[in-house]
């Protein structure tokens, strides 16, 4: 095998399978492997083109008759939290986020397992073992980090390791942060931790001077994915490129399941 063939990505198309987001529809994906010295550059390029990363695979929908999955990225520097978002921030004022190396722990897996059992027991990840989780975190040839979210008591020092309540697996791109996967302690669902972690990533991107936070696919009408449309202003990937969408352009629903 030549160096050129190793560095040139090969793309593959999956067979049709039931869509996990919209009823009575099927999905197909195009994917490639993120390996080699240029994996980070390729991940950057493909993310800009609407791909998502899962371990060492980059993929995007390639459905025959459906274009419901729309890549979205929040414009971090212009984002201003709404009244409801400010309530979420206040509700989680006792939560401290810490950036760590992409190293899996049993503490993380315990929450991951509880999260899947409570919220996604019928999903494609429902049977993931601790080894599967370790692979999800570690099998990366790009710049990846773990952000842990811990509860801090009123009298606790900020550096004390409090109870872990949420985790985000995040890629660092040339122009932003890409939230690969996030999960939280289901018993803490009243905190709206999913929303809080997105708000924290927007703040982190702004502090790092990065313009965007990539949220993955927004699917209008999908209970699982529709919430991503609430973080404005944002850009959505269309056939002509990334198009800006502001809050005034569409009605917003200020609650996340």
Swiss-Prot record:
One Gene Ontology cellular component annotation held by this UniProt entry: cytoplasm
The record's section on SUPFAM superfamilies has:
Acyl-CoA N-acyltransferases (Nat)
Q: Where in the cell is it found?
A: Cytoplasm
InterPro entries the record matches: Acyl_CoA_acyltransferase, Asp_Glu_LeuTrfase, N-end_Aminoacyl_Trfase, N-end_Aminoacyl_Trfase_C, N-end_Aminoacyl_Trfase_N
Q: Name one GO molecular function term.
A: leucyl-tRNA--protein transferase activity
What is the protein name stated in its UniProt record?
A: Aspartate/glutamate leucyltransferase
Q: Which NCBIfam families does the entry link to?
A: PRK01305.1-1, PRK01305.1-3, PRK01305.1-4, PRK01305.2-3
Keyword check for Nuclease: no
- Offer one example of a GO biological process linked to this entry: ubiquitin-dependent protein catabolic process via the N-end rule pathway
Its keywords, alphabetically, are: Acyltransferase, Cytoplasm, Transferase
Q: Which family does it belong to?
A: Belongs to the R-transferase family. Bpt subfamily.
Enzyme Commission code: 2.3.2.29
Name of the top EC class for this enzyme: transferase
> Which purpose does this protein serve, as stated in its record?
Functions in the N-end rule pathway of protein degradation where it conjugates Leu from its aminoacyl-tRNA to the N-termini of proteins containing an N-terminal aspartate or glutamate.
Could you tell me what reaction this enzyme catalyses? Answer: N-terminal L-glutamyl-[protein] + L-leucyl-tRNA(Leu) = N-terminal L-leucyl-L-glutamyl-[protein] + tRNA(Leu) + H(+); N-terminal L-aspartyl-[protein] + L-leucyl-tRNA(Leu) = N-terminal L-leucyl-L-aspartyl-[protein] + tRNA(Leu) + H(+)
Q: Which gene encodes it?
A: bpt
């Amino acid at each position: 095998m030549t160096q050129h063939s190793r560095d040139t990505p090969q793309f593959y198309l999956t067979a049709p399978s039931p869509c996990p987001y919209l009823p009575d529809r099927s999905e197909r994906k195009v994917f490639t492997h993120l390996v080699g010295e240029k994996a980070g550059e390729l991940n950057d390029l493909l993310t800009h083109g609407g791909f998502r990363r899962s371990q060492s695979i980059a993929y995007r929908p390639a459905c025959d008759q459906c274009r419901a999955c729309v890549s979205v990225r929040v414009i971090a520097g212009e984002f201003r939290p709404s009244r409801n978002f400010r309530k979420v921030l206040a509700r989680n004022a006792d939560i401290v986020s810490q950036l760590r190396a992409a190293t899996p722990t049993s503490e993380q897996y315990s929450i991951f397992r509880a999260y899947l059992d409570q919220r996604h027991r019928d999903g494609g990840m429902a049977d993931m073992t601790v080894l599967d989780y370790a692979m999800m975190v570690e099998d990366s040839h790009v710049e990846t980090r773990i952000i842990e979210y811990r509860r801090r008591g009123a009298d606790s020092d900020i550096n004390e390791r409090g109870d872990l309540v949420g985790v985000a697996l995040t890629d660092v791109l040339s122009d932003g942060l890409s939230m690969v996967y996030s999960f939280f302690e289901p018993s803490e669902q009243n905190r709206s931790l999913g929303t809080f972690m997105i708000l924290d990533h927007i703040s982190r991107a702004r502090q790092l001077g990065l313009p965007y936070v990539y949220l993955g696919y927004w699917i209008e009408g999908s209970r699982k994915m529709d919430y991503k449309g609430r973080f404005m202003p944002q850009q959505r990937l269309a056939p002509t490129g990334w198009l800006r969408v502001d809050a005034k352009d569409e009605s917003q629903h200020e609650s996340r399941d």
